[in-house]
Amino acid sequence: MQEIESLHQSVLLQEVLQAFAPLEEGVLIDCTLGLGGHSKALLSQKPHLKLIGIDKDKFAQEIAKERLKAFEGRYNLLSGGFAKRFKEALEMHGERIKGVLVDLGVSSLQLDDDNRGFNFHSHALDMRMDLESDLNAQKVINSYSVVALEKIFRDYGEIKEYKKIAHKIAERRAKKPFKDAKDLSDFLSSFSKNKKIHPATLVFQAVRIEVNSELEELKEFLQCARNLKGAILCVISFHSLEDALVKNAFKDYAKNCICDPSSFKCTCSNNHALGTILTKKPIIPSPEEIKNNRRSRSAKMRVFQFKP
């Protein structure tokens, strides 16, 4: 546990604490509990706050539970997808919910575990957040049709040569199926010309998003979050697809006029905004944080305040 405390670094921790500074009591939902770094800091600073922590990864949740021992009685941990669990919590707690945090990053524990398949050198080709899920990365890479691979590489990886990569993977797996993440990573490196990032980065991102239904879950959550009243919503994203969904949802929440854009005149009374966007531009890590934690470099945090 001491090793976890020293190695685990919660992204934008001080900025998250600042975002929730106005909260004094009520319920805060950490939709992506992970190892509990953000939750631990918030419970430490807010003695009257109650916490609901949600995570698909039961192993990570056990570690978080150990880290939160000092706050026994002030938190409740739930397993499962955060969109579904958040909806249930919202129905149960309603306006007692004063804050919601979503950190969409993969935890260091998952990235560094060679048995999980998230890194380029893993001995597995898995990438599941929920180890009880049926779909894993090996099934995607070795059994998806070429057309299906093209679609996820284009839509989830934003890969320019998505057709070429899908066809090369299909040709190679016909001779010899991919056995682990290192095998896939080495294969992609053998023909990719991308020098800015590791040749496997965007393919791994696309497959991980597919395996965990990440964008669908985020969309479902953002739709449900419209029903919050008087709460602060803080979302940390790590790539442009996530950030675009959050940015557009917040803009939609803040709209006063809900008339059809083709209308010549507003007839809706122009007062339908659900609240206020508190971050005109996303908050990003400081150079010092990036220096201390390279994995934080692509993080973007957006904050929205819902009206009571």
UniProtKB/Swiss-Prot annotation:
GO CC annotation: cytoplasm
Major subcellular site: cytoplasm
Binding positions for S-adenosyl-L-methionine per the UniProt entry: G36, G37, H38, D55, F86, D103, Q110
Family per record: Belongs to the methyltransferase superfamily. RsmH family.
Gene3D superfamilies (alphabetical): Putative methyltransferase TM0872, insert domain, Vaccinia Virus protein VP39
GN (gene name): rsmH
Class of enzymatic activity (EC top level): transferase
Subcellular location: Cytoplasm
Keywords of the record: Cytoplasm, Methyltransferase, rRNA processing, S-adenosyl-L-methionine, Transferase
EC number: 2.1.1.199
Reactions mediated catalytically: cytidine(1402) in 16S rRNA + S-adenosyl-L-methionine = N(4)-methylcytidine(1402) in 16S rRNA + S-adenosyl-L-homocysteine + H(+)
Function, in words: Specifically methylates the N4 position of cytidine in position 1402 (C1402) of 16S rRNA.
Gene Ontology molecular functions: rRNA (cytosine-N4-)-methyltransferase activity
Keyword Metal-binding listed: no
Pfam families cross-referenced by the UniProt entry: Methyltransf_5 (PF01795)
Example GO BP: rRNA base methylation
Protein's name according to its UniProt entry: Ribosomal RNA small subunit methyltransferase H
Superkingdom per UniProt: Bacteria
InterPro entries noted in UniProt: RsmH, SAM-dep_MeTrfase_MraW_recog, SAM-dependent_MTases_sf
